[in-house]
């Protein structure tokens, strides 16, 4: 198997997800120490894709050349580069983080979550419960253009007005102008920002402009806000205290993550790259859980890319211990919309930052399939 992610880069704007390959290697140590997958050794090759399209394609070509059975639990924003190479080699892509739109359209991709689209659709539903008006601050880009319709579907379902759309550059060092617009147009309601790594910068600007004693509810989605970010920016004193956040999985303190935490404690050997609160690490754990189910279903035959694909397409069920709904990728399990044909998991979770921790705002999962199928293509 192969797992890739951006690990080391001299580009200060590049994302770094060193915990992803580290989690994959930790999972393999655990599996192999406990008898393998029905006696088979799990071998993991890691690749640093450097957060570049060239690096992503290089990793994909290496996966094909080394005849790996699957690429599992990886992170890359460059699906337009890696997916064609995997398709040419017939190698499946299992449980990618969801940072590339191609992960939700390629016939060889088997996503374990609904990507940012599901988060936005769910976030509209979450905000619709308590926000009379919403300002959405999002990237001034083609990808950003698809955000308002998804968010608005959830708001409109709660009989709330559509959000106010505020565009922001992704290379800014300050967002005072956008923060002022968001504050003015929120009407005392809610301000949500989905700016990836720049979300922190926006809310720094926003909190400085807020009138004393008048705290507007802020919100975002996982990927733009995370527990490691909250910890790094002050915990309970961070600008995210009180924020609504929509995620894919149960909050990090949920007991369903205990097995993963135990494995990290025993087999990561103190590797500080692995943060069990990090959604990228959690997604890699779930992806390898899916791989394990597929390999077990193959039985005594050789594990090849073709057999992994046939097993997944044939309807093998993946029980993630309640971290997601049961996952299957038969044709009838797919959402099948034009924009997101490969999504099978349309469930999200509603969380809120309390005392510096992401905690469940509402128990269980919320299904946003209807909001995804109603959204226009972005």
Please identify what each model-predicted range represents:
Residues 1-5, 42-46, 133-135:
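Short, well-ordered beta-strand elements
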Residues 1-25, 49-53, 140-145, 276-282:
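Extracytoplasmic "Venus flytrap"
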Residues 13-37, 153-154:
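Short, polar/charged alpha-helical segment
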Residues 15-19, 35-103, 112, 169-173, ...:
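Beta-alpha junction/loop-to-helix N-cap segments that form part of ligand/metal-binding clefts
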Residues 68-168, 214-241:
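Extracytoplasmic ligand/sensor domains, especially the bilobed periplasmic-binding protein
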Residues 77-84, 189-210, 287:
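Hydrophobic alpha-helical
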Residues 206-286, 368:
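Extracellular/periplasmic periplasmic-binding protein-like sensory domains
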Residues 271-281, 292-358:
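Segments of small-molecule ligand-sensing domains
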């Amino acid at each position: 198997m192969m797992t890739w992610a951006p690990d080391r880069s001299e580009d200060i704007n590049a994302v770094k997800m060193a915990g992803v390959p580290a989690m994959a290697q930790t999972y393999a140590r655990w599996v192999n120490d406990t008898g393998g997958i029905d006696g088979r050794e799990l071998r993991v090759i890691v690749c640093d894709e450097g957060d570049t399209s060239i690096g992503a394609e290089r990793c994909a070509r290496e996966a094909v050349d080394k005849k790996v059975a699957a690429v599992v639990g990886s992170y890359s924003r460059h699906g337009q580069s890696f997916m064609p190479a995997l398709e040419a080699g017939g190698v499946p892509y299992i449980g990618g983080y969801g940072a590339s739109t191609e992960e939700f359209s390629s016939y060889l991709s088997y996503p374990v979550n609904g990507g940012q689209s599901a988060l936005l659709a769910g976030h509209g539903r979450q905000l619709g419960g308590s926000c009379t008006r919403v300002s959405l601050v999002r990237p001034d880009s083609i990808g950003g253009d698809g955000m308002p319709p998804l968010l608005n579907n959830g708001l409109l379902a709660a009989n709330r007005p559509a959000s106010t759309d505020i565009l922001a550059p992704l290379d800014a060092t300050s967002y005072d102008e956008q923060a002022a617009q968001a504050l003015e147009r929120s009407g005392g309601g809610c301000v949500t920002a989905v700016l990836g790594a720049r979300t922190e910068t926006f809310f720094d600007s926003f909190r400085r402009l807020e009138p004393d004693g008048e705290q507007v509810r802020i919100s975002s989605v996982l990927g733009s806000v995370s527990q490691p970010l909250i910890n790094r920016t002050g915990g309970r004193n961070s600008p995210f205290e009180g924020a609504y956040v929509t995620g894919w999985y149960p909050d990090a303190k949920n007991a369903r993550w205990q097995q993963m935490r135990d494995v990290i404690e025993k087999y990561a050997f103190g590797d500080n790259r692995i943060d069990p609160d990090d959604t990228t690490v959690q997604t890699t754990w779930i992806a390898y859980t899916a791989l394990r189910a597929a390999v077990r279903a193959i039985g005594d035959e050789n594990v090849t890319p073709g057999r992994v694909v046939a097993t997944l397409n044939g309807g093998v069920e993946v029980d993630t211990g309640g971290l997601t709904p049961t996952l299957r990728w038969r044709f009838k399990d797919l959402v099948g919309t034009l924009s997101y044909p490969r999504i099978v998991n349309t469930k999200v979770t509603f969380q809120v930052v309390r005392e510096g921790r992401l905690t469940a705002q509402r128990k269980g999962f919320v299904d946003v399939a209807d909001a995804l199928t109603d959204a226009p293509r972005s």
